[in-house]
Curated annotation (Swiss-Prot):
Limits of the DRBM domain: 155-225
Enzyme class: hydrolase
Compartments where found: Cytoplasm
Protein name (database record): Ribonuclease 3
Organism: Yersinia pestis
A biological process from GO: rRNA processing
Entry's family note: Belongs to the ribonuclease III family.
Gene name of the record: rnc
InterPro entries recorded: dsRBD_dom (IPR014720), RNase_III (IPR011907), RNase_III_dom (IPR000999), RNase_III_sf (IPR036389)
Length: 226
């Protein structure tokens, strides 16, 4: 695999593997090799659940078990992990078999989400529980700041998606139309196309995720759901 791509990924993760073979295994789908990432994924899934549960317990001392469970489910579900994978540009690093490559596996949410969990397992084996806990909390910083008990825990993208799914309408599409500024200080502009709205709605933010959330917020307002 291209070392430039691997080094770029490690910078985005905020962690450099001592055992590079663990990183390569974490990026390997079962379609590509018998030494794939599913065992690492199993481990990472449990670690992620523990770290997020522990952090929610610390942040919300008066919230009951049911609300904490719902918040944890929101934070560790597949589409959240896939969104995080796209922030890392993980798709370009995946090791996939010919069939998955041909069918666009590098874009598939389930593969992206599973790979994030495998990376968590890999970092843990390469270091220790304290290192991976710190890293997970860094990755989740903005999401943990935004989440709250009850329905308000759902971010605009999630609320918009659930609204459309409940009416059997197509999911919204998000398109980056402009990126301005230097790498350390960028502004993203997103167009969001939503069934029921004649024109795309526009969102801007300092990251693609924030711009998409801003666009979804505008869509909810136009649909009079906010």
């Amino acid at each position: 695999m291209n070392p430039i791509v691997i080094n770029r990924l490690q910078r985005k993760l905020g962690y450099t593997f001592q055992q590079q073979e663990l990183l390569l295994q974490a990026l390997t789908h079962r379609s590509a090799s018998s030494k794939h990432n599913e065992r690492l994924e199993f481990l990472g899934d449990s670690i992620l659940s523990f770290v997020i549960a522990n952090e929610l317990y610390r942040r919300f001392p008066r919230v009951d078990e049911g609300d904490m469970s719902r918040m944890r489910a929101t934070l560790v579900r597949g589409n959240t992990l896939a969104e995080m994978a796209r922030e890392f540009d993980l798709g370009e690093c995946l090791r996939l078999g010919p069939g998955e490559l041909k069918s666009g596996g590098f874009r598939r949410e389930s593969i992206l989400a599973d790979t994030v969990e495998a990376l968590i397992g890999g970092v843990f084996l390469d270091s220790d529980i304290h290192t991976i806990e710190r890293l997970i909390l860094e990755w989740y910083h903005s999401r943990l700041e935004e989440i709250s008990p009850g329905d308000k825990q759902k971010d605009p993208k999630t609320r918009l998606q659930e609204y459309l799914q409940g009416r059997h309408l197509p999911l919204p599409s998000y398109l980056v139309v402009q990126v301005r500024g230097e790498a350390h200080d960028q502004e993203f502009t997103i167009h969001c196309q939503v069934s029921g709205l004649n024109e795309p709605v526009i969102g801007t933010g300092s990251s693609r995720r924030k711009a998409e959330q801003a666009a979804a917020e505008q869509a909810l307002k136009q649909l009079e759901l906010e």
